[in-house]
Amino acid sequence: MAATRALPAGLGELEVLAVGTVLLMEALSGISLNGLTIFSFCKTPDLRTPSNLLVLSLALADTGISLNALVAAVSSLLRRWPHGSEGCQVHGFQGFATALASICGSAAVAWGRYHHYCTRRQLAWDTAIPLVLFVWMSSAFWASLPLMGWGHYDYEPVGTCCTLDYSRGDRNFISFLFTMAFFNFLVPLFITHTSYRFMEQKFSRSGHLPVNTTLPGRMLLLGWGPYALLYLYAAIADVSFISPKLQMVPALIAKTMPTINAINYALHREMVCRGTWQCLSPQKSKKDRTQ
């Protein structure tokens, strides 16, 4: 079990403060944008559709990632982990579960868009709700396995936040890593890529794509790919040769995904923007309804 400890060698207080500042900016940005998305969905009846339920689920997952980053930011600014061993396990579980829900949620949105635009059938509630439940139950299941001994949660290199421990590189870690990564990274990445690929093929003749078909897959790969590469390296080599500062880069990149997802999947869409504006301008919205 993890225990409270001092800063690791090779990291000064100023560098930990810099990490904490970056995490704080990422956390506040993700919470604000995804919170606005969730608020607009809850307050605007036009947005309460099965397809938008998938986007709402993604926003909830990304809010969870941002809340996890906020805890890490505060701990980094304190330059210590103040929540003890059990707090580390909870922090690791919550961060891992919401990260998996975000990755799989992105794939669910991609499949939902393919279903909507390529099958000429509206996504039904009796399909969207089980899909969202599956995403969250699957993510919670995989995140709970390290608590039961398959994998392990421990401190990240700065020692002020917790994640899946990759420093051991033993058989237990390797077996969990490759199994988990196949079902929770490679499969969602494949679903995302093929869904948007089929959409490109369907709309290639008209030349008009209803959504951006290249950005979601690239962002999924660029946002979570560095983490995957770090874990892969840890499985085949001694990760201690990589400096703690460099090991923190994938985590900082991944924490930008809530902001990117909020902009890409929700806030740039005309209907969501209109719903958000109605929520922020209640007097104007009331006036419009009375006319």
Curated annotation (Swiss-Prot):
Entries under PROSITE patterns matching the protein: G_PROTEIN_RECEP_F1_2
InterPro entries to which the protein is assigned, alphabetical: GPCR_opsins, GPCR_Rhodpsn, GPCR_Rhodpsn_7TM, RPE_GPCR
Extracellular domain ranges by topology: 1-15, 74-91, 152-175, 241-247
Record topological domains on the Cytoplasmic side: 37-52, 113-130, 197-219, 269-291
A single GO BP: visual perception
GO molecular function, one term: G protein-coupled receptor activity
Membrane topology annotation: Multi-pass membrane protein
Cellular compartment(s): Membrane
Disulfides per UniProt: 88-162
N6-(retinylidene)lysine modified-residue sites: 255
Cellular component GO terms held in the UniProt record: plasma membrane
Keywords assigned: Chromophore, Disulfide bond, G-protein coupled receptor, Membrane, Photoreceptor protein, Receptor, Retinal protein, Sensory transduction, Transducer, Transmembrane, Transmembrane helix, Vision
Description of post-translational modifications: Covalently binds all-trans- and 11-cis-retinal.
Primary role: Receptor for all-trans- and 11-cis-retinal. Binds preferentially to the former and may catalyze the isomerization of the chromophore by a retinochrome-like mechanism.
Entry's family note: Belongs to the G-protein coupled receptor 1 family. Opsin subfamily.
Record PANTHER family: OPSIN
Protein name per Swiss-Prot or TrEMBL: RPE-retinal G protein-coupled receptor
The organism of origin for this protein: Mus musculus
